[in-house]
Regions:
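N-terminal beta1-alpha1-beta2 module of alpha/beta enzyme domains
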Residues: 13-94
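An alpha-helical appendage that flanks or caps ligand/catalytic pockets
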Residues: 21-27, 145, 151-179, 220-327
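Acidic (Asp/Glu)-rich catalytic clusters
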Residues: 24-26, 87-95, 122-128, 204, ...
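Flexible, glycine-rich active-site loops centered on histidine and acidic residues
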Residues: 27-45, 107-170, 210
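Conserved, mostly hydrophobic/aromatic
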Residues: 31, 63, 71, 90, ...
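Hydrophobic faces of well-ordered beta-strands that scaffold small-molecule active sites
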Residues: 31-35, 67-69, 99-101, 129-133, ...
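Active-site mouth loops of central-metabolism enzymes
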Residues: 35-50, 104-111, 187-194, 302-309
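A conserved active-site cap/scaffold subdomain adjacent to cofactor or substrate pockets
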Residues: 200, 204-216, 225
Length: 355
């Protein structure tokens, strides 16, 4: 990983312009948005939630396929903890874009409750709701205990919990004693999410779409895709594998501006690693003096798939990514400090991807 003026640079293989034509053309790949609903250090969650809706409306007009938010707890810089409640707000303020959880951390919840929540959403907003499931707690162990109280759920229960949840959302069977109302028969589309090979294998064996968390854990991306595709079994949901990759985004009109705006993201990841506040900080001219060499390398690893640059650089990197992965869909997260910069970043991406 190379650096310039204290900022992150892409690995050489993503900077190269001499590469084969991708198996999929970027114009044919769906693009989506993952909003972490970031909270600024000088603002509060209320503005973050309003900005999330505004962003959803913005990308809907730009033709994005879906808008997801993720469950996180006990993090002062992320306002999407009440995920199902937030999704109702987002779906009610939009009209065509799919909205969903990317994802619900199933160890934190009883499958029946999740089925009822998302069954309600699907009843209110038919054919627009997605349910992505993760097996991590989305928090520290102390917070996980606070969420579960007397319950003993764990990641080891995840496969069985997924099965139970799918049964609640599917058609009622004659011998079914517990039903989700709303929920039963809604068949809310379920995705499996993950940053490990476990979730990749499970998604393949269940014939479910798979979203890999390459926006923060790119190290195992290629292996996870291979495992998912190799283990895929056709199902009532899918007849062939479907892979969506998470991608960090910092697009601007020039490469220099994009690199400058990305320093807010670098500071946020650095704070996460140090156990400090995750509230957003304004960009800086240089990260020199803010991180130690080993921290710089750790942030670089965390954001190894980040797309930072102007339109031409973003396009070149995305073409390489598709050539390497043959992904079916890309979902982008953009944590810029100013809301208007985030809006512009998604505009540039839409122009680059679909003209």
């Amino acid at each position: 990983m190379l650096f310039h003026r204290g900022q992150l640079q892409q690995p050489a293989h993503l900077n190269s312009r001499s590469y084969p034509r991708p198996m999929k053309r970027l114009e044919d790949v769906k693009i989506s948005t993952l909003d972490l609903v970031p909270v600024r250090h000088d603002k509060g969650p209320a503005e973050s939630l309003r900005n999330s809706l505004n962003l959803a409306q913005h990308v809907e007009k730009l033709g994005y396929n879906r808008f997801w938010v993720a469950e996180h707890h006990n993090m002062d810089g992320i306002a999407s903890s009440a995920t199902a409640v937030l999704l109702a707000y987002l779906a009610g303020g939009t009209s065509t874009i799919r909205v969903g959880a990317g994802g619900i951390m199933l160890p934190n919840h009883a499958p029946l409750v999740v089925a009822e929540q998302f069954g309600t959403l699907a009843s209110l907003y038919p054919d627009r709701i997605d349910l992505g499931l993760g097996r991590a707690p989305g928090s520290d162990q102390m917070t996980a205990r606070a969420l579960r109280r007397e319950r003993s759920g764990s990641a080891e229960d995840f496969p069985d919990d997924v099965t139970e949840l799918m049964e609640y959302l599917g058609p009622r069977t004659p011998d079914q004693k517990v039903i989700a109302v709303p929920g039963s028969g809604t068949n809310v589309p379920i995705w499996l999410l993950g940053s490990s090979l476990f979730s990749a294998q499970l998604a393949g064996m269940r014939g479910l779409p798979y979203a890999f968390a390459s926006h923060f854990a790119p190290r195992y991306m290629h292996e996870a895709i291979r495992v998912y595709r190799n283990h895929f079994q056709p199902s009532a949901v899918l007849d062939k594998p479907y892979v969506m990759l998470g991608v960090p985004l910092s697009a601007a009109d020039t490469d220099e501006q994009a690199e400058y705006l990305a320093t807010s993201v670098y500071q946020r990841i650095l704070a996460l690693m140090r156990g400090h506040s995750l509230m957003q900080r304004p960009p800086v001219d240089s990260m020199d003096g803010l991180w130690l060499p080993h921290e710089r390398e750790a942030v670089a690893s965390f954001l190894g798939l980040a797309m930072v640059g102007g339109p031409e650089k973003i396009r070149a990197k995305l073409d390489v990514l598709l050539e390497q992965t043959d992904a079916d869909e890309l979902i982008f997260t953009c944590d810029m400090y100013k809301h208007e910069d985030r809006l512009r970043s998604y505009e540039i991406l839409a122009q680059v991807a679909h003209g």
